[in-house]
A protein has these predicted regions:
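Acidic/polar residues at beta-strand termini and the immediately following turn/coil
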Residues: 14-16, 24, 93
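Short, surface-exposed beta-strand-loop junctions and turns on beta-sheet-rich folds
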Residues: 7-10, 28-30, 96-98, 107-108
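PEST-like low-complexity, intrinsically disordered acidic/proline/serine-rich tracts
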Residues: 1-10, 14
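A short, compositionally biased
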Residues: 15-17, 129-130
Length: 166
């Protein structure tokens, strides 16, 4: 479940495991609406908080090493992930082995778009380094920056948080 507040309005997007839904006061009715089927796979990938490298085989991905490249002054391994018709590239820092960047495609408003996600400001949470800043770009323009303020682990969350309201 993701909640954002923009211009005083609350946006909610959630997935209960199979059904995706959202509340979008700007582009919808302001009530919970089902997410189109073609976006469910993207939502499931977003819900995978372990990242792209952990459990990739179990998630149906195969990986190829495409050598070393420069990413903003850091040497990184360029890894190509393939699953069915999907392809994405993950750039992993050659020293720290942290994800620096991801290039993927996403369906937005019925269009497939190239998305570049840049990860930074890694912090240790419960023994795992997590990016506290994620910048999403399309066609070289930043379209969204997510900055985490706090992260809590092992917090009890009711299943009803993910159930689509009537």
């Amino acid at each position: 479940r993701v909640e954002n507040e923009m211009q005083g309005m609350k946006f909610v997007m959630a997935l209960d495991g199979s059904t995706g839904w959202m509340i979008n006061p700007m582009g919808g009715t302001g009530k919970a609406e089902k997410v189109p089927e073609d976006q469910i796979k993207d939502m499931k990938d977003m819900a995978d908080i372990d990242g792209d490298l952990v459990g990739y085989k179990e998630d149906g991905w195969s990986v190829e090493n495409h050598g070393s490249v420069d990413v903003d002054g850091s040497t990184a391994y360029k890894l190509k992930f393939t699953r069915e018709k999907d392809t994405k590239f993950i750039y992993v820092d050659a020293v720290s082995f942290l994800e620096l960047k991801k290039e993927s495609k996403a369906s937005m408003m019925g269009q497939e778009m190239d998305i570049e996600t840049v990860y930074s400001n890694y912090q240790n949470i419960g023994g795992t380094l997590r990016p506290f800043q994620m910048e999403m770009r399309t066609q070289g323009t930043t379209v969204q920056t997510i900055t985490l303020k706090t992260v809590e682990t092992n917090v009890e969350i009711a299943d009803s948080m993910f159930t689509m309201p009537k």
